[in-house]
Structure formats: C-alpha cells, structure tokens
C-alpha cells in the first residue's frame, strides 16, 4: 500500500522541523495550539494538492522550512499593521501562517483561482481563523488601498503586477515581498527607485529575502 503524504511519520517530521527552524531563525516560539493549526494546514495542503496544483513542495522537512518558517519570518516585520492583504495567496503563504501568528492582525487572502480560493476558505473554517478572510479577485480589479500592509510571496507576472502597486502605495502603506534580490532590483529599475526599500535576508535560504517597500 502506498504511504500517505501525511502519515504520522510525516506529521511528526513536519512538526519537529518547523519548531527547530523557527528556533534557528531566532523567532519567538509558537504555542502548541498555533503549531497544531499549521500542522492542520499542512495536512490539508497535501490532501488538496493531489487534485489541484497548490505547490510542488510537499515533503515535510522542505515544506516546514520553505513555506511555513519563511512565511513566519516576515511576521517580525509586520510591525503595527492591523490589516494585511496577501496578493495572490495561492496555497496560503504567507497569509495563513501570519494569521496564525498574529491573532490581532486582520488578514485577507486575495486569490483569482476559484479552486484555490475554495481551498483557502476550507482552511479558514478548519483552523478556526476568525481573523482570516478570502476574496476571489484579480489584483487589478481589487481596491487594495485600504490595507496597512500588502504582501506577496508567489505571483505570476510578479514584475508586471507589483511595479504599479509599489508606485501607488499610500504614504503610510507598505509592501512586503518574499522574493529574490533580483526582483527588487527589477522593481527599482521599473519605478525609477520611487520607494524606500528595507531588505532582510531569510536565514538558511539561498538568495531569498523579505523586502519592505514604502513611499520615501
């Protein structure tokens, strides 16, 4: 019989890798309840991924480091923001981990795909995330200016879509990108350096950063 993607060994490996990686990143330790919520999300991700393309990364150790711990790393940069909009949330990164981490933060996941939006809605219900909402829409059709913090981790046509967003930020609004340094350079070139950039290297990640963009 084929082994389940989320058998007890995989769940245990995911949990231990997540907790160890969070500690190695120097992040605040999650509560047992918070880790349980992320484990639940991981199990749903593996199950749904058999039917719709959510991610290529499902191995428990890789998913814990590259999806979950990386998403949580951005949590230290959220600051005093009270509302966050995840542009093209996909499987829920970074929106779901950030909603689990910060119960005081109202998180909206913006997703154009009907199937992925349905997955995120099921995640909200399963995890009991009262501070997490899902809207099915494209970035260009959605009024994002009401949010304190915009974020994106996996966007098709990233350079094409994020350039206009970066140039239209409100003075108090910030854009948090999980990306490579190359993307930041491309955005700076396309927008003639029309914003301030604060770049934080993600620990244990090759050429991956979290960048905060804001109006000068």
What are these regions (language model features)?
Residues 87-89:
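Conserved beta-strand/loop positions that form the S-adenosyl-L-methionine
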Residues 95, 102-108, 112-216:
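S-adenosylmethionine
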Residues 71, 96-99:
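Hydrophobic alpha-helical segments in the ANL/AMP-binding
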Residues 2-81, 85, 115-118, 122-130:
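Class I SAM-dependent transferase core
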């Amino acid at each position: 019989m084929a082994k389940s993607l989320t058998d007890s060994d995989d769940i245990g490996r995911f949990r231990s890798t997540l907790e160890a990686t969070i500690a190695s990143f120097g992040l605040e330790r999650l509560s047992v309840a918070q880790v349980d919520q992320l484990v639940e999300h991981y199990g749903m991700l593996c199950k749904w991924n058999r039917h719709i393309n959510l991610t290529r990364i499902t191995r428990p150790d890789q998913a814990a480091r590259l999806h979950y711990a990386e998403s949580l790393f951005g949590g230290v940069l959220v600051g005093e923001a009270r509302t966050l909009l995840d542009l093209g949330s996909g499987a829920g990164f970074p929106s779901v981990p950030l909603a689990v981490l910060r119960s005081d933060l109202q998180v909206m996941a913006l997703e154009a795909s009907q199937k992925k939006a349905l997955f995120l809605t099921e995640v909200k219900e399963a995890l009991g995330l009262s501070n997490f909402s899902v809207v099915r829409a494209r970035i260009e059709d959605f009024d994002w200016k009401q949010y304190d913090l915009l974020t994106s981790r996996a966007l098709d046509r990233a350079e094409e879509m994020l350039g206009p967003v970066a140039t239209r930020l409100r003075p108090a609004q910030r854009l948090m990108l999980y990306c490579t340094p190359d993307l930041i350079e491309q955005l700076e070139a396309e927008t003639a350096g029309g914003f301030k950039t604060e770049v934080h290297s993600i620990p244990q990640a090759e050429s991956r950063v979290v960048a905060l963009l804001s109006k000068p």
